[in-house]
Amino acid sequence: MYKSLFFCLKIFAVLILVGCGITAYIIYHYSRDLPDYSQLARYYPPSVTRIYSHDGKLMEEYAFERRVFVPINSIPSSLIESFIAAEDKNFYNHPGVDLLGIVRAAFLNISNYLHHRRMEGASTITQQVVKNFLLTNEVSLERKIKEAILSYMISRVFTKEQILELYLNQTFFGRGAYGVAAAAQNYFNKSVEELTIAESAFIAALPKAPSELNPERNYARVKARRDYVIARMFEDGYITKDAAKEAMDSPIVLRKRAKEETVTADYYAAQVREEVIRMLNSKEEFYTGGLTIITSLDAKMQQLAENSLRKGLREFDRRRGFRKPIANIPLDNWQEEIKKLPSPPSLLEYKLAVVLDVADNHAEIGLIDGSKSKILIAEMKWARSNLKSVKTLLKKGDVIVVEPIKDGYALRQIPEVNGAIMVMNPNTGQVLASVGGYDFSTSKFDRVTQALRQPGSLSKTFVYLAALENGIKPNQIFNDGPIEISQGPGMPSWRPKNYEGKFLGEITMRTGLEKSCNLITVRVATAVGLTKIVDIIKRFGINNEPKKVYSMVLGSIETTLSRMTNAYAIIANGGKKVEPHFVELIKDRNGKIIYRRDNRECLSCNVSDSNLDIAILEIPKEDIYRVTDEASDYQITSFLTGAIDRSTGYAAKKLGKIIGGKTGTSNDSKDTWFVGFTPKIVVGSYVGYDTPKELGKRATGSNVVLPIFIDFMSNAYKDEPSLPFKVPDSIKLIAVDRATGKITPSGTVIEAFKVNNIQMLENEDMIDNRDNNDIFDYVPSKEDQSQEIY
């Protein structure tokens, strides 16, 4: 008997030795090519870069993975306990691998298999860290062995808190959220400190199947999984029975960010993204660096600018009439038929509807949700001139675009025309608002910064400014009559025309700009010389390489809305150089400043000089200097306020503010512009087709774009006081006769003269251009008089 027992013991000992040997060999074999886990000590997870408006509203988030890193000491114990209960009951006691858990899971899975239930895993939190950071998701014995070895090794080097920090910041929770902080924001719009027990349990339940556990699709399953975690928390002694019951009884309510915490500014955010990537010279750093970017954007102005642009584009498009229905469908099963149609691009707040019946004075419509309503003929009058009956416009089965209004719906259509608007502070260069098109989701092409278009009469301002810089007085008389300019050997002569084909005779230079006279502008250009006009266009940043041709003075050069708005901002601020900028400040993931635009205090950025003991990106600062002298600048400003008071911008006078501005219309009315300004704000807007074509025979900056400016200013600037432009000491204001330019006590206009020209104020003859061999007067034919140039 003893011999048998001794023999059995020897066999058992041999088996143990063999087992230990095999285990040692396995550990040795698989340990030879293990990944370096020391990298975990240098863990800097990819983090979300966030862009904010100047007043603190979230504009956009950019990331390859939406993750917000939060240190373990900032994660509440209730959230940690939720994960311990859900994922690894013995986390604080095992050495990385839970042998008891493996045995328990094995027996449990036998029962689960027999009863057709889901299999239970036995991976510890440490093993999940190893899988997420160091290994792949490959299902193999080799990976599991390496996972166990690494988990044991990591547990000897890292504390439990360090392992938890890695796990809670790396795990995927669905909805694009990586880490518990991102999950708390995405699902509940809360920080981790604000989560309730029920919300913590919900987040802890997600790692098992983050894509499937969606309460909006499968509420019962998600609640069951959450309640399981709550029950485990109670069983493990983390919460009381009453707390568990209260948590289980609470519904799962997902919350998005409150609307007042965010601002929609897609074009602006895209511009900021490109600008910061250029600054950093790294796309990777932008998308993974967890940057906080404070911009110049004013959230209120941005929303108003977007509203005004869309309103203006829609109103202009409606003036062109109704094009046609989107489709025509059978009415037998209209609700299903309309659902089959692809949603038109840029539908926005508009809706699709189908015409169910038509009467003379209204149309009955059905909407996708099955509801029915009416459109009265009054809401279709824009569609066709002298519309007498709806039956001549629509028929049964027509699919149309409608807009909800107070007492029903109105017929609408998505505009084909596009445009842009930009709002700047002329003194600082801050871009307060920028909308690059009707709808970013349809077209990401930014018409503020990317669209090169002809500015038309907007460029005339700088021809007159060049004249003022060179000593020509504002009351100088020029002849608004037909002219002919030689363009060189073998080239036909150029005969510019005024917009309406009329001639005003002898008028002052001021009147020439106020009335946007083409012929006066050309005569002023010949008096100054093209070389000086090319110089001023470059100086103001309108175009870096303008062609030295006379048509340039009437706006044949190409420029962008951003450049043109900035050029007028220089005029608005008294002639000092300014550049549009979008970015005020950038912080890294640790809150340290890596870029600040200048040394002015940014009260809303929570910045102090104590933050600045780090390497700051060297962003070259532009020297502040004058682009034009302040006297000439005030004179041209006076001209431009006159254009609002008496001419093409007159409609803006109803705003009741002192405003300078200029309209612009290119040849054939393909591009229309308006830039208006006060001492505190400059607003530029543009309307045109992306593929240039005529907007209409009588389409001008005055009737297409100026309404956008007026709508914006009436909302954004209505409570601001009307501020006068500062009169420099080098200017003397004198009353003159508007028609003749002569000084008179009862003058009809207050003119701005340079002090050093006071002694020459006796009105002189108009400038004699007869010495210029390239220009001469001519008598126009009837055909010439009928032609128009803008």
UniProtKB/Swiss-Prot annotation:
Keyword annotations from UniProtKB, A to Z: Antibiotic resistance, Carboxypeptidase, Cell inner membrane, Cell membrane, Cell shape, Cell wall biogenesis/degradation, Glycosyltransferase, Hydrolase, Membrane, Multifunctional enzyme, Peptidoglycan synthesis, Protease, Signal-anchor, Transferase, Transmembrane, Transmembrane helix
Pathway annotation from the record: Cell wall biogenesis; peptidoglycan biosynthesis
Gene: mrcA
Protein name according to UniProt: Penicillin-binding protein 1A
Keyword check for NADP: no
Major location category of this protein: membrane
Residue spans, topological domain Periplasmic: 28-790
Top-rank lineage group of the source organism: Bacteria
EC number: 2.4.99.28, 3.4.16.4
Location(s) in or outside the cell: Cell inner membrane
InterPro entries on file: Beta-lactam/transpept-like, Glyco_trans_51, Glycosyltr_51/Transpeptidase, Lysozyme-like_dom_sf, PBP_transglycosylase, PCB_OB, PCN-bd_Tpept
GO CC term (a single one): plasma membrane
Pfam families reported in the protein's UniProt record: PCB_OB, Transgly, Transpeptidase
Protein's membrane topology: Single-pass type II membrane protein
Region (Transglycosylase): 49-220
